[in-house]
Amino acid sequence: MGAPSALPLLLLLACSWAPGGANLSQDDSQPWTSDETVVAGGTVVLKCQVKDHEDSSLQWSNPAQQTLYFGEKRALRDNRIQLVSSTPHELSISISNVALADEGEYTCSIFTMPVRTAKSLVTVLGIPQKPIITGYKSSLREKETATLNCQSSGSKPAAQLAWRKGDQELHGDQTRIQEDPNGKTFTVSSSVSFQVTRDDDGANVVCSVNHESLKGADRSTSQRIEVLYTPTAMIRPEPAHPREGQKLLLHCEGRGNPVPQQYVWVKEGSEPPLKMTQESALIFPFLNKSDSGTYGCTATSNMGSYTAYFTLNVNDPSPVPSSSSTYHAIIGGIVAFIVFLLLILLIFLGHYLIRHKGTYLTHEAKGSDDAPDADTAIINAEGGQSGGDDKKEYFI
């Protein structure tokens, strides 16, 4: 019976000594800090806090155990290290222009009984240098293989390299990592190979560095490549639909790298060539029906030749309106406009006369000395007009 009764006592003792059980009684005099990451050349702030300072001051020391600040008092003469805040419950300092050598564990201490400490691990990121591309020597011929190398030094931790050509991602080999002589940073390198086409002529191959210290900023280098390829050509007529009697230019538009240096024009069924020149246009000063046929233009460079063909069909001359008919049309338009204006004037004149209606008798009668008789005569005259049967004439 003794063994079972001792089991609860053993469990209670185990719980009291467990690490979790220790958290049940929090030490208010224990300071706390946080780890920090900073880019080389930047500024880091170290913050130490304590709840119960027990009338003691906080202190910061560097990885070499050199005291930096004791309370608000500077202990190490380093202008990069400045006091940010000093209270009984907090001591914060800043380190500017951080170097790789500043990396390590910084200690915050409070001199209670016993002395309590907290650690802050400062990680310094090395910024990678701008990458360098090597391996490109001169122009490449179409379908040859281009091999480029890219290298960047000074990153910590080691950076990653990526390739692209224009908007297209290129898959280079795995990034190679080598430690720099300072023992802290790394040099990374990568290579890429691809077969070039004529579309790659003038393209930019870009090597970019990916690293957390850049915070999304672009750090890259580009290499423009030149590709030599055989020419192509096409024939463009001017005008597009030539007619008999017109002047015609057949433009032979050659493209290539290098551009064609010579153009040879031929017409099927005729010998020798019509034209051999460095100029690309074939000129017909005055087209005839006999000029119809198939023409070929051969564009030549030191990379090869290409022949384009064009079938010319000379259309009948278009009827040209005579100058006299054009003149007559203009005169007719002017006459029609004048007649239209006269009609408008006649309409307005008629409207005016209707609104101001009067007769000779009316005006003469009103101008006589015997006004009453004149009015009577006017009334009688109007009455005679309305009567229709009894028409009388009065002389005044």
Swiss-Prot record:
GO terms for biological process: heterophilic cell-cell adhesion via plasma membrane cell adhesion molecules; homophilic cell adhesion via plasma membrane adhesion molecules; protein localization; synaptic membrane adhesion. Residues 1-22 form the signal peptide. The modification Phosphoserine is found at S386. It comes from Rattus norvegicus (Rat). GO terms for molecular function: protein homodimerization activity. CDD domains: IgV_1_Necl-1 (cd05882). The cytoplasmic region mediates interaction with EPB41L1, DLG3, PALS2 and CASK. Belongs to the nectin family. Residues 128-226, 231-313 form the Ig-like C2-type domain. This is Cell adhesion molecule 3. Pfam families: C2-set_2, Ig_3, V-set. Glycans are attached at N288. The keyword Isomerase does not apply.
